[in-house]
């Protein structure tokens, strides 16, 4: 026990991950990869190929699914690293995946803010309902926020301070530890303002006005289905932001202000897990927004039930055949 404790302390002092974290990360990321890949591939296919009447919220959902897929496709490299304990994919690719940890929540929050503003227009400003069908503006908004986020993330590829330099065997601590980003704290806190606080305040502002309008009965002209759908979207977005993104960014700010050297942070690891969970929780949004996605999920579930029933029947028929054969042999 003493040897294990000393080994873990040595790992933490060197900035590497304890074995418990690696095992938990392997299990967690495996589940996220399998569920998230199926959910977001299905969503992207539904929104881009089977949805005939596209609206602004459809465009936003396509971008959410695409962003989730980009992030999810990086998970197998993480899992390989945690399983093998070394990084064979090169230093530059490690930088890219490390930057992706910051890129994903930054862009995701803006996309969720766009969806919140879209629901604000649908409930509080129904006279501008035609704007909700103007997909051109939605495409420009999404393209602009993609470019803006990429531009502010590129400097992370050029960091001088690198926790993985001169490591043997090669490591890639950047994909889970964000403490090495202290070297660019000015950029970090600028990013916190523009990619966390501003979209968060936009969402809160939209929700406050929407709730105020609902309580004062200013939305009586809206169809009940539109109200119900919008409220479900709002509640889902609020829960997702509070669970997945707020803890991550609070931890990010705290770690950037701490004066200690780079080391493994259990709180940082946990909030990073929560942030990754967002790629799967988006399924609730997809299910609420799109009837086609609902139908697709239901068809998959029915098909699985059908396969199970076929297997049960085949097992039963096989057991009956074997029983009849035994009886014939006895006779």
UniProtKB/Swiss-Prot annotation:
Disruption phenotype: No visible phenotype. However, reduced number of CD8alphaalpha gammadeltaT IELs has been reported. In addition, GPR18-deficient mice display impaired resolution of infections and diminished responses with RvD2. Residues 1-26, 78-95, 160-191, 258-268 are extracellular. Gene3D superfamilies: Rhodopsin 7-helix transmembrane proteins. The chain crosses the membrane at residues 27-47, 57-77, 96-116, 139-159, 192-212, 237-257, 269-289. Glycans are attached at residues 14, 188. InterPro entries: GPCR_Rhodpsn (IPR000276), GPCR_Rhodpsn_7TM (IPR017452), GPR18 (IPR028335). Keywords: Cell membrane, Cytoplasmic vesicle, Disulfide bond, G-protein coupled receptor, Glycoprotein, Membrane, Phosphoprotein, Receptor, Transducer, Transmembrane, Transmembrane helix. This is N-arachidonyl glycine receptor. The gene is Gpr18.
């Amino acid at each position: 026990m003493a040897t294990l404790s000393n080994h873990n302390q040595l790992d933490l002092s060197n900035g590497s991950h304890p074995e418990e974290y690696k095992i938990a990360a392997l299990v967690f990321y495996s589940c996220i990869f399998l569920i998230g890949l199926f959910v977001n591939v299905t969503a992207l296919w539904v929104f881009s190929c089977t949805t005939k009447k596209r609206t602004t919220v459809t465009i936003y959902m396509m971008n959410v699914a695409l962003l989730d897929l980009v992030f999810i496709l990086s998970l197998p490299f993480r899992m390989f690293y945690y399983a093998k304990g070394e990084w064979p994919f090169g230093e530059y690719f490690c930088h890219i995946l490390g930057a992706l940890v910051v890129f994903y929540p930054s862009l995701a929050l803006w996309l969720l803010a766009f969806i919140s503003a879209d629901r604000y227009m649908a409930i509080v400003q129904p006279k501008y309902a035609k704007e909700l069908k103007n997909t051109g503006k939605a495409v420009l908004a999404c393209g602009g926020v993609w470019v803006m986020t990429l531009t502010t993330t590129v400097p992370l590829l050029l960091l001088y301070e690198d926790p993985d330099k001169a490591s043997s065997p090669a490591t890639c601590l950047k994909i889970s530890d964000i403490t090495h980003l202290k070297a660019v704290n000015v950029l970090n806190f600028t990013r916190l303002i523009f990619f966390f606080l501003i979209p968060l305040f936009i969402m809160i502002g939209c929700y406050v006005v929407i709730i105020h309008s609902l309580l004062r009965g200013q939305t009586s002209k809206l169809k009940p289905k539109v109200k119900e759908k919008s409220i479900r979207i709002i509640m889902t977005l609020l829960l997702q932001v509070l669970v997945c993104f707020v803890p991550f960014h609070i931890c990010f700010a705290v770690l950037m202000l701490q004066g200690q050297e780079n080391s493994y942070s259990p709180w940082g690891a946990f909030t990073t897990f929560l942030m990754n969970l967002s790629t799967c929780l988006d399924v609730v949004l997809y299910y609420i927004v799109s009837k086609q996605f609902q139908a697709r999920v239901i068809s998959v579930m029915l098909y699985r039930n059908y396969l199970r029933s076929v297997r049960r029947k085949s097992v039963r028929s096989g057991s009956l055949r074997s029983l009849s054969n035994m009886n014939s042999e006895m006779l």
